[in-house]
Amino acid sequence: MLGFTEGIFLVLTVTEFILGNLVNGFIVSVNGSHWFKSKKISLSDFIITSLALFRIFLLWIIFTDSLIIVFSYHTHDSGIRMQLIDVFWTFTNHFSIWLISCLSVFYCLKIATFSHPSFLWLKWRASRVVVGMLWGALVLSCVCTMSLMNEFKIYSALTGSRDTQNMTEYIRLKRHEYNLMHVLGNLWKIPSLIVSLIAYFLLLLSLGKHTQQMQKYSVGSRDQSAEAHRRAMRIILSFLLFFLFYFLSFVILSSSRFLPETKIARIIGVVITMSYLVGDSLILILGNNKLKQTFVAILPCECGHPKPGSKRFFAS
């Protein structure tokens, strides 16, 4: 019989799972149909579509893990099932994070304006820089996943072991090492976090300076343009906060192995992770001109607002 905590957790995960698939499925269907009709796709649309697709895979993996936590928690960390979930979760999550970093760099190079020679050199080669990052992200994700698979050699020695008086000190040490490697696995995510933070900071700095300059001439179309800049800054800040929120969830999930209430910590980490996969994708829709127009067009009622898309800071 499910307890109160497990029941609330199950309701939240089912809701987030459905919403996440709808939101990310919408992105894939809109960009995919446009790609199919026009036979071409912009780099930003390709990254956004790939990100949404990987997030759908990640939602299914996390939802499967959530069901195991609720209905069969005592077998959560045992057997080939755990290994498969860990491998697929690691690859899809790591590559998704790098896709976010690539998207932030692309927006930064396309939108921000700085006179530094190094920035201008990168700006003129924005597409090539981001494509190179995508290939590098794929390689790093594979390496990260392979390093995790090496951990299973340790895990195989621990299968069936329990904390009993007969357990040798060697087995205890190996189990601690296995858990520690899971925590240290978060170090693979630090480079992508640094890249994203730098890109978001530069983009906010550039938009902030440009907005201040435009406010001096806040009449007519320039006033509308300044307001569009402020909306873009709010979207970027939302991206950044959600991204930091996402990293917090993985710190909680990884550290849960060393916390007294392991199950509660995992539940909190999973809920935060799935919330991010829904919320951040919604921000992607609101920040993209084409996706936002299509989203508003399918709403069942008129909201009394003008059609979006007067300014295209995140449009493809």
UniProtKB/Swiss-Prot annotation:
Coiled coil ranges: none
UniProt GO molecular function: bitter taste receptor activity; G protein-coupled receptor activity
InterPro entries: GPCR_Rhodpsn_7TM, TAS2R
UniProt topology in membrane: Multi-pass membrane protein
Cytoplasmic side: 29-50, 108-128, 208-234, 288-316
GO (cellular component) term, any one: membrane
Positions bearing carbohydrate: N166
Entry function: Gustducin-coupled receptor implicated in the perception of bitter compounds in the oral cavity and the gastrointestinal tract. Signals through PLCB2 and the calcium-regulated cation channel TRPM5.
Protein name: Taste receptor type 2 member 3
Organism encoding this protein: Rattus norvegicus
The encoding gene: Tas2r3
